Curated annotation (Swiss-Prot):
InterPro entries listed in its UniProt record: ARM-like, ARM-type_fold, XPO1_C_dom, XPO4/7-like
Annotated GO biological process: protein export from nucleus
Protein name: Exportin-4
Annotated compartments: Cytoplasm; Nucleus
Gene3D superfamilies xref list: Leucine-rich Repeat Variant (1.25.10.10)
Keyword Protein transport appears in the UniProt entry: yes
PANTHER family per the UniProt record, alphabetical: EXPORTIN 4,7-RELATED, EXPORTIN-4
């Protein structure tokens, strides 16, 4: 309609229509209704999709006065040029580009958003033309160069806008204008652009900045011009240079990296290795450093230049020269000045880049004096930024610039100090001492430290200001603490004794304070007014000292065997000749006494004495509890103590001496195998656990840390053997089995972990009699209590009573804990034990079908058992588990089918259930990949009967499970993204791994599954659509192999061919899906060649325009030319996918017009 109107000279009517629509869209909500607004939006959408709108758009740009209409005209030109590229003459495109550029130049007062959109259209035209070399940037650069040299600020700003538009459009393969072209297309354009055109832009920018450097006293307008060019320089230097031959998937990964380092091609060598360029940016920064916005850009430019690497350097010598020159420039820029807040992050980024990007041998090759000045500067800045970061914490600033800068510098230190190849031992010791001392000082209260001190004195934070939601310091500052701990190890000679003396001093003071409070309470119990300021300061000091000690003595180890850090081991070995072992053991074993009161206390091992200092903190806490002073204690300190003890025990307690070249004698004597020290310390730690669970049951985090310590004590057989020799262990087990207070007050997650620990302990090296005793005292009571409850005649009537529900919940949590404790050597006993429960749990599903939290917990028990045990089960046992899981799903499905979810909470509950069911099915499916049950050795002696002859695979079970829950998957539930993704991942997984199972499915399930795939491709997110396309490919391949042209799957794939054809040819789709869609399309074309030809013929027959008809026919012929007839051959498929890229570039979007 629009195109026809334009062709008939009806442009004024079109303009009037668009201007009226713009008025509606721009009107306040009170003036227009929803329907009017939608109609107005439809007019613009229809206009933008109209065929060849160029003449009418030009007319609009020249005559309309409505900015929004001008903006839409520019957008319509941009989209139509790409859409109709193959139909346009090259001269028409060139004149269109010239028209747009001239239009902007002649109208300096255009609204910014209109100007930017017109320039974006120019950039898109240049980009699309760069691929077939019909347009290049040379003429544009010539014009821009003239604009820059005009000296007119308005014109220079416009020149900058033109360059920025080009840069933005070419810079990324994934974030450019959505013009329906593939990532490869954008990637190829980017590669061509970055070779020469990008450097041209940089040179133009440098010219402007040189002019800026020369000028004095700039007016505001000129300053604004230079700021824009500086931002442009930053954009160029932050360019993510694409390496050659990078596939689509890798382009996306490559471009998603956050920290882009400057790695230009060789062609940039002359430009960037010219020392005047680097000097220019240092000079510019010195000139504008007090202007916050400009300083951000100039520092970012310098940070990018500090990351220069790759083929731009011809040899190592040029790298050394560049680095030396840069460090000189940096030291000259920052020496003797007070760094502004806005400079901190930038300067730390520069230093971080220099240290991490330049190889260490280049760093050490610069003149010694220069390197020494650089490292001293790094130490000074680290301490200074650390102090400012601590101040930010006190003032609770939103923008923590110094904290970010400090973190970067600490990471830089780690890079340096961990390199013993280029720096001799002790090279950084003094610097490490400096940074470590500064950190400790910032975290201690006055007078020893500066915590909470502002420039004007004390700014102490009130206790209630600390938010409940605040992350724990040990998590929030884990990277910082890891760096400080590493620096502490480098300077162990200084740092370990320092921490010991600070901790011992605080313990003495804490003990004294608590005694004073006790006396005060005894003297006047009613007074109650105790000044806690001193205590709070002590607790905060101890908190930070324990955290630093924990990170100094042990590393974070996830999934690895924790090892004593070599620096700590060497330090202990080095001084072992000066150590008296007996005194060391006495200090370790007397946490109730002051270390200095023990004769010869100075001849103890320093590492063990540091551990002893923390045991003394723990002892003061225990004594305060016994003296009924719990209300004065800090739960945070309690958490810190057990966190440290867990971390320490994992690494040092009964360390495996085979893992070390040499071991410290004091360590092996104090807590090695078969020593009194290790037995004593295990007993001490166990006592701590039991005391904490009794006293702190309401403090969930502290109770959780405490049971984690218990798990650490029993997860290794060697430690567990010592634990089970303690009477306390058996008392704890019996108490838990009886559910007597205070253990039954613990939260459910803590009870679950406690059960896990008790089970792990139960499988230590006990004799048969002990094992039987353990079974009788720990696991049997659980079973007995459970059966007593559910076998009561009136169970149905009393099941909702609070006491009964608590008993059931506690049992279910305990079952999860038991499952979590599964290992290959206990799976036989635990599986048989748990199976009895699982069958009873299915009965509970009926009883509690209207109690969502119980249903959820029952499913979770099954999820845990499947997750932990399925991989160890032989065929018969796996069959038992499969049957139990399917019965569970049948009951769940029966209870929930057709049930009306009246409120959001009920829907949320079902969402949680189904998410767990998806996890259960995924866990069962893992049996097909992870199977340790080659022999049923682990079940010898535990087999109730022989395996049956049924062979059912996990895939069969999972498909049957999917059949049960599919009817529950309502459209509303699939709106939960995590559930939707989990569901589609599961069915795609099944289709990819077991495509042969799909045709054998019952008819209803097969239809449901096909409908799910259709729904996923047409109505879900692009991630789900991609999963469905990935599922269709193996199904089509399976169909081709089977060669059954009358099967239901054959008919379904024919329908999918039409869907994928429409998606690729007729609809706008996310270009990132082109590969998945292309692979599915190719396989479907191989399977249904006649239908594909029919689809093409039908499409061509609808084309009225002979030019479009011919172009489309040629494009389709070319598409299948490389694979005629198409076969399921990888080489042919790859050729087809390459042709498809070209096809999409030429005709993609051509048919999405009105």
């Amino acid at each position: 309609m629009m195109a026809a109107a334009a062709a008939a000279g009806g442009a004024p009517e079109v303009i009037a229509q668009l201007e009226n629509a713009a008025k509606v869209l721009m009107a306040p909500p009170s003036m227009v209704n929803n329907e009017q607004r939608q109609h107005a939006e439809h007019i613009f959408l229809s206009f933008r999709k109209s065929k060849s709108p160029f003449a009418v758009c030009k007319h609009i740009l020249e005559t309309s006065k409505v900015d929004y209409v001008l903006f839409q005209a520019a957008t319509a030109i941009m989209e139509a040029v790409v859409r109709e590229w193959i139909l346009l003459e090259k001269t028409s495109i060139e004149s269109l580009r010239t028209f747009l550029l001239t239009y902007v130049l002649q109208r300096p007062n255009l609204q910014k958003y209109v100007r930017e959109q017109i320039l974006l259209a120019v950039a898109v035209i240049v980009k699309r033309g760069s691929l077939d070399k019909s347009i290049d940037c040379k003429s544009i650069f010539h014009e821009v160069s003239q604009l820059i040299s005009s000296g007119n600020p308005t014109v220079q700003t416009l020149a900058c806008s033109i360059l920025t538009a080009l840069l933005s459009e070419f810079s990324s393969s994934s974030k450019t204008s959505n013009i329906g072209l593939s990532m490869e297309f954008h990637g190829n354009c980017k590669r061509i652009f970055q070779e020469d055109d990008l450097r041209q832009i940089f040179m133009l920018t440098v010219e402007v900045l040189q002019e800026f450097r020369r000028r004095e006293n700039l007016n505001a307008q000129m300053s604004s011009v230079f700021q824009r060019y500086l931002a442009l320089a930053n954009q160029v230097l932050s360019w993510n240079f694409l390496p050659p031959n990078l596939g689509r998937h890798y382009i996306a990964m490559f471009e998603s990296s956050q920290n882009v380092m400057l790695k230009p091609t060789e062609s940039w060598r002359e430009t960037l290795l010219d020392s005047r360029v680097m000097e220019l940016f240092f000079t510019v920064h010195r000139k504008i450093r007090e202007d916050t916005d400009m300083a951000q850009d100039s520092l970012q430019c310098l940070a990018q230049l500090a990351s220069l690497h790759g083929s731009v350097f011809p040899d190592e010598g040029s790298q050394v020269d560049y680095l030396a020159h840069f460090i000189e420039g940096l030291l000259n820029t920052i020496s003797g000045i007070e760094i502004e807040d806005s400079e901190a992050v930038g300067i730390s980024s520069i230093i971080s880049n220099l240290i991490t990007v330049f190889p260490r041998n280049i760093l050490t090759a610069i003149p010694n004096e220069l390197f020494s000045s650089f490292v001293n500067c790094l130490a000074h800045l680290t301490c200074s930024f650390g102090r400012s970061a601590a101040l930010e914490e006190v003032l609770d600033k939103d923008d923590m610039v110094y904290m970010e800068a400090y973190d970067k510098l600490l990471e830089s230190w780690l890079t340096l100090v961990q390199d013993d190849k280029h720096f001799h031992k002790g090279f950084f010791t003094q610097h490490a001492v400096q940074v470590f001392n500064s950190y400790i000082q910032c975290h201690l209260a006055a007078p020893d430290g500066t915590r909470n001190l502002t420039a004007n004195g004390v700014a102490s934070r009130e206790e209630e200001e600390i938010s409940e939601l605040q992350e724990d310091d040990r998590d929030q500052f884990c990277d910082q603490l890891a760096s400080v701990g590493m620096l502490g190890r480098i300077a162990a000679e200084h740092c370990i004794p320092l921490l010991t003396s600070l901790l011992e001093d605080r313990v003495t003071r804490l003990h004294g304070q608590l005694q004073r409070h006790q006396q005060q309470l005894l003297a006047s119990p009613a007074s109650g007014s105790i000044d806690n300021k001193v205590l709070d300061d002590l607790y905060e000091d101890i908190h930070w000292l324990i955290l630093v000690t924990g990170y100094l003595l042990a590393n974070d180890t996830q999934g690895e065997t924790p090892l004593i850090p070599p620096e700590v081991m060497e330090y202990s070995i080095k001084h072992s000749t000066e150590v008296d072992i007996n005194t060391t053991l006495q200090i370790l074993g007397s946490p109730g006494e002051k270390a200095s009161s023990i004769p010869g206390y100075n001849r103890t091992d320093s590492v063990i004495r540091l551990l002893s200092a923390i045991l003394r903190v723990s002892e003061v806490e225990s004594r305060a509890i016994r003296a009924n002073l719990t209300h004065l204690l800090s739960p945070q300190m309690g958490k810190d103590i057990v966190w440290f003890l867990k971390r320490w025990a994992k690494t040092y307690l009964l360390a495996d001496e085979k893992l070390y070249d040499q071991i410290s004698l004091p360590f092996s004597t104090a807590f090695g195998a078969d020593t009194e020290g290790s037995q004593w310390i295990v007993g001490y730690l166990l006592e701590k656990v039991i005391s904490n669970l009794a006293v702190w049951s309401s403090e969930q985090d502290l109770a959780n840390d405490t049971v984690q310590l218990l798990v650490t004590l029993v997860e290794r057989r060697e430690r567990a053997n010592l634990v089970i020799q303690c009477e306390n262990w058996w008392n704890l087990a019996k108490q838990f089995a009886r559910r007597s207070p205070p253990l039954h007050y613990l939260s459910s997650s803590v009870q679950r972990t406690l059960m896990k620990a008790l089970v792990l302990g139960g499988f230590a090296h006990m004799d048969t009699e002990m094992k039987q005793q353990y079974w009788t005292e720990v696991l049997q009571p659980l079973q007995q209590r459970f059966l007593n409850v559910i076998n009561q005649e009136n169970f149905q009537q009393i099941c909702q009573e609070e006491e009964v529900k608590q008993e059931i919940t506690a049992t279910l949590e305990a079952l999860c804990g038991i499952a979590e404790a599964t290992q290959i050597d206990n799976v036989a006993i635990l599986f048989n034990f748990l199976m009895d429960f699982l069958n009873n749990c299915i009965g509970l599903m009926e009883v509690y079908k209207n109690t969502p939290e119980t249903v959820n917990l029952i499913i979770e028990v099954f999820v845990e058992v499947a997750h932990k045990q399925i991989c160890y089960l032989g065929e018969a046992k796996a069959m038992n588990l499969y049957e139990a899981c399917l019965t569970l799903l049948q009951v769940y499905s029966k209870n929930n089918l057709g049930r009306q979810r009246i409120d959001v909470t009920a829907e949320e509950d079902q969402y949680q259930d189904l998410l767990l069911i998806m996890e259960l099915l995924t866990n069962l499916l893992s049996k097909e990949f992870i199977d340790f049950s080659d022999t049923d050795e682990v079940f010898r002696g535990h087999e109730p009967g022989q395996a049956t002859n049924r062979t059912v695979s996990a895939a069969d079970v999972v498909l049957y499970g999917v059949n049960l829950v599919l009817p529950l998957m309502s459209q509303d539930l699939l709106k939960f993204p995590s559930l939707c993704n989990q569901y589609y991942k599961l069915i795609t997984f099944i289709c990819e791994i077991f495509p042969e199972k799909i045709p054998q499915l019952p008819e209803d399930l097969f239809k449901s599954l096909m409908y799910s795939l259709e729904l996923g491709m047409s109505s879900m997110s692009s991630e789900v659509c991609q999963l469905c396309l990935e599922a269709v490919t193996p199904l089509a391949e399976q169909c081709a192999k089977a060669q059954e042209t009358d099967s239901a799957l054959f008919l379904a794939t024919r329908h999918f061919l039409k869907m994928v054809f429409d998606m690729l040819v007729l609809q706008k789709h996310n270009t990132e899906m082109t590969t998945a869609a292309g692979e599915a399309f190719y396989t479907l074309v191989c399977l249904h060649q006649a239908e594909y030809s029919e689809l093409v013929e039908t499409l061509l027959s609808t084309q009225q325009d002979p030019v479009i008809y011919q172009r489309l026919a040629d494009a389709f012929n070319k598409l299948t030319a490389s694979s005629t007839p198409p076969t399921l051959d990888r080489k042919q498929k790859m050729a087809f996918l390459k042709s498809l890229e070209e096809f999409m570039a030429n005709v993609g979007g051509l048919l999405c017009v009105k």
